[in-house]
């Protein structure tokens, strides 16, 4: 059975944001605006996305 995945794209810069939010972007594997990563749909990943929802867009 295949695991569900989410496509997360960074839409805004991490410059001038809270250090914890910048660290969360790094934890998600995002490096720059427009960068997209595919991540497993787990509660921990969902929590990280919820923390920086205003800087990312999610598909899937």
Curated annotation (Swiss-Prot):
SUPFAM superfamilies: Ribosomal protein L30p/L7e. It comes from the Bacteria. Keywords: Ribonucleoprotein, Ribosomal protein. InterPro entries: Ribo_uL30_ferredoxin-like_sf, Ribosomal_uL30_bac-type, Ribosomal_uL30_CS, Ribosomal_uL30_ferredoxin-like. Pfam families: Ribosomal_L30. GO terms for biological process: translation. GO terms for molecular function: structural constituent of ribosome. GO terms for cellular component: cytosolic large ribosomal subunit. Belongs to the universal ribosomal protein uL30 family. Part of the 50S ribosomal subunit. This is Large ribosomal subunit protein uL30. It comes from Shewanella denitrificans (strain OS217 / ATCC BAA-1090 / DSM 15013). The lineage of its organism: Bacteria, Pseudomonadati, Pseudomonadota, Gammaproteobacteria, Alteromonadales.
